């Protein structure tokens, strides 16, 4: 692995960490407010609390996916960069160095799920791939470059 490809790989990891910290801070603040309302509504009635807790976990999970899908799809389609990628000085482009379309950005995000589900092997694949592409890069025919 060349020094340049190592630096991009490290920048990708840091960019993803920055994005997840940002997104989960927003997500957590939203759900702290929701949890406060949940406690007010249930008045600690055990059955009502259990029902609302199940609903809360469902909404939390769905909103997690939606928030991440919207964030990564929007930013990648808009500029090829999430906030984390902007900070780290990297960008997503097509294999022929063009900006990606919204549909490609969505496909790439969908690939995140495929990359993550089997023990994050799809993300780790970038370490051994000759072009340092993760599964979601291969699926969407994209790559990450320095800006």
What are these regions (language model features)?
Residues 1-117, 146-147:
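Short, small/hydrophobic-residue-rich motifs at membrane-helix boundaries and re-entrant hairpins
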Residues 124-147:
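Hydrophobic alpha-helical transmembrane segments and immediately flanking/interface helices
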